[in-house]
């Protein structure tokens, strides 16, 4: 019979339990940080002749009512407003409906966004050479 004993006379699996438990604990604790839901509002004109609203104008009104904004980005004939807190999405829609004139569609969406813990290791062509 083969005796698999470690250096101090304990079975080898005793030495593997602590690293495995620590690894599982790290995965459980870091998963919410890596995958977060991001709440966005997409604003686009419904009628011909309407242009996109000014992002700074929207920012002033949303910020004035206590809604925290991550970013406001133009994208494919629409304006995408990323909110800091998903809980404020309905309140932001109400503010935008009050501020914007008729003819704009406001579509809410939530997406899971992956954050990189170590952005240094991203494959970036500019860093090569």
From Swiss-Prot:
Which residue windows are coiled coil? none
**Residue spans, topological domain Cytoplasmic:** 1-14
Per the record, membrane topology reads: Single-pass membrane protein
* Gene Ontology molecular function: any one: protein kinase binding
Q: Which InterPro entries match?
A: Modulator_MzrA, SecD-TM
Question: Membrane-spanning regions, if any?
Answer: 15-35
| UniProt xrefs under Pfam families | SecD-TM1 (PF13721)
Stretches of the chain found on the membrane's Periplasmic side? 36-129
Keywords of the record, alphabetical order, are:
Cell inner membrane, Cell membrane, Membrane, Transmembrane, Transmembrane helix
GO (cellular component) term, any one: plasma membrane
Instruction: Name where it's found.
Output: Cell inner membrane
According to the record's subunit comment, the protein's assembly and interactions are: Interacts with EnvZ.
What family does the Swiss-Prot or TrEMBL record give for this protein?
A: Belongs to the MzrA family.
Q: What does this protein do?
A: Modulates the activity of the EnvZ/OmpR two-component regulatory system, probably by directly modulating EnvZ enzymatic activity and increasing stability of phosphorylated OmpR.
What's this protein's name? Modulator protein MzrA
Task: State the organism named in the record.
Answer: Yersinia pestis (strain Pestoides F)
Q: What is the lineage of its organism?
A: Bacteria, Pseudomonadati, Pseudomonadota, Gammaproteobacteria, Enterobacterales
Name of the gene this protein is made from = mzrA
């Amino acid at each position: 019979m083969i005796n698999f004993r470690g250096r101090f006379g304990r079975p080898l699996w005793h030495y593997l339990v602590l690293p495995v438990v620590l690894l599982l604990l790290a995965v459980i604790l870091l998963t919410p940080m890596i995958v977060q839901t991001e709440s966005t509002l997409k604003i686009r004109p419904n009628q011909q002749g309407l242009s996109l609203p000014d992002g700074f104008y929207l920012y002033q009104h949303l910020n004035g009512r206590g809604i925290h904004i991550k970013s406001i980005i133009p994208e494919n004939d629409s304006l995408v407003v990323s909110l800091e807190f998903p809980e404020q999405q309905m309140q932001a829609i109400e503010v935008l409906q009050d501020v914007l004139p008729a003819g704009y569609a406001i579509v809410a969406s939530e997406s899971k966004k992956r954050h990189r813990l170590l952005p240094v290791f991203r494959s970036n062509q500019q860093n090569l050479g």
